[in-house]
């Protein structure tokens, strides 16, 4: 049956929700896929000498902590690194693909790759898959145009900013960055601000945790700092508790005899020549 063409209205459309509910009623045993929440806090900012990137180290599988010391800062080029949030496999393989392309590009042209080139390849690749590659990336590096920082989203959109944060803990991290960021910060001040931003994401989000990793990129090279800070130290137990028998009163007691049926078995030894 034909329907009149109407102008799309703004807001959330519940057509797919009604469709999924109808399919669940008609097809017994059908499991409608649900959106998977991924947890990470990644951040980056530009300071006077370059770019500094930071990330937490927790990898989760739904509500289970799969890895407490996961590396989320990926190598792209000697002066370009990338932080990955979202699906760990998608972020890992996407950054590996771009790193190999940048190596071939450097060998064929004889020039160092630019940060804008890396960002362009990433956003074109992610846009091609229309968000099915769940990788949110922060690209930072230093080239002949100076320090640059980009945020790339899973659907291919991007933005160039002096500071940014992505992941499930981005709200807490951005609150710290927006409050304390200043242009032309020193390395010590930028490093302290980055640690505070990622720590805020770790403490404010259950999907983020572990330690704080960082990567400092300048025109002379990059330095990866593993376990720069450990905001969530394990709590030490005060001691073990011992309770003597009779501490807890027994109110009722019931004894049920268990009948067992004895079965006789004969074992025949194997003849060995």
Curated annotation (Swiss-Prot):
The modification N-acetylmethionine is found at residue 1. The active site is at 40 (nucleophile). The record marks 39-40 as: Cleavage. It is found in: Cytoplasm; Nucleus. Autocleaved. The resulting N-terminal Thr residue of the mature subunit is responsible for the nucleophile proteolytic activity. GO terms for biological process: cell morphogenesis; humoral immune response; proteasome-mediated ubiquitin-dependent protein catabolic process; T cell proliferation. The modification Phosphoserine is found at residue 230. The keyword Protease applies. GO terms for cellular component: cytosol; nucleus; proteasome complex; proteasome core complex; proteasome core complex, beta-subunit complex; spermatoproteasome complex. It comes from the Eukaryota. Its EC number is 3.4.25.1. Induction: Up-regulated by IFNG/IFN-gamma (at protein level). Up-regulated by IRF1. Up-regulated by TNF (at protein level). Up-regulated by tetrodotoxin (TTX) in glial cells. Up-regulated in Crohn's bowel disease (CD). Up-regulated by CD40L via the NFKB1 pathway in cancer cells. GO terms for molecular function: endopeptidase activity; threonine-type endopeptidase activity. The keyword Protease applies. It holds the Pfam family Proteasome. It is linked to Proteasome-associated autoinflammatory syndrome 5: An autosomal recessive, autoinflammatory disorder characterized by recurrent, polymorphic disseminated cutaneous rash with annular lesions, non-specific lymphocytic infiltration in the skin, fever, failure to thrive, and persistent hepatosplenomegaly. Disease onset is in early infancy. The proteasome is a multicatalytic proteinase complex which is characterized by its ability to cleave peptides with Arg, Phe, Tyr, Leu, and Glu adjacent to the leaving group at neutral or slightly basic pH. The proteasome has an ATP-dependent proteolytic activity. This subunit is involved in antigen processing to generate class I binding peptides. This is Proteasome subunit beta type-10. It comes from Homo sapiens. The gene is PSMB10.
